[in-house]
Amino acid sequence: MKVLVICAVLFLTIFSNSSAETEDDFLEDESFEADDVIPFLAREQVRSDCTLRNHDCTDDRHSCCRSKMFKDVCKCFYPSQRSDTARAKKELCTCQQDKHLKFIEKGLQKAKVLVAG
């Protein structure tokens, strides 16, 4: 019983978090009208200008694509701390997804298959 309660709370937290991000995107537009909903959703689904996972996002850190549930985050690091070359001193950023979010996403996909089938 405890496991079911914990799983239910986890699922509700994830679902509310993903829907809250979508609502925040809607609220950012100052002139939001009902006619603007369809073009907004089309832009979010297509979004060809986003940076794919594990690709360079150094120049535009807010351009990472969105997976099915969560948005990827631009994480920066230095390639090598040992050498004094110019390349080692340059910061490198790539779009990545946290491992716990990846596991949650895969788990929910498997749960959907289990419930549906």
Swiss-Prot record:
Keywords attached to this entry: Amidation, Cytolysis, Disulfide bond, Knottin, Membrane, Neurotoxin, Secreted, Signal, Target cell membrane, Target membrane, Toxin
Propeptide intervals in chain numbering: 21-47, 82-87
Signal sequence interval, chain numbering: 1-20
Protein localization: Secreted; Target cell membrane
Modified-residue entries (Alanine amide), positions: A116
GO biological process, one term: killing of cells of another organism
Keyword Membrane carried by entry: yes
InterPro entries linked to this entry: Spider_toxin_CSTX_knottin, Spider_toxin_CSTX_Knottin_CS
Expressed in which tissues: Expressed by the venom gland.
One GO CC term on file: membrane
Gene Ontology terms for molecular function: toxin activity
Record keyword Secreted present: yes
SS bonds (residue pairs): C50-C65, C57-C74, C64-C95, C76-C93
Comment, domains: The presence of a 'disulfide through disulfide knot' structurally defines this protein as a knottin.
Subunit and interaction comment: Heterodimer of A and B chains; disulfide-linked. Interacts with CSTX-1 (AC P81694), and with CSTX-9 (AC P58604).
Function statement: Synergistic toxin that induces or increases a cytolytic effect when combined with CSTX-1 (AC P81694) or CSTX-9 (AC P58604). When alone, has a weak insecticidal activity, with an unknown molecular target.
Family, as annotated: Belongs to the neurotoxin 19 (CSTX) family. 12 subfamily.
Record's protein name: Toxin CSTX-12
Organism: Cupiennius salei
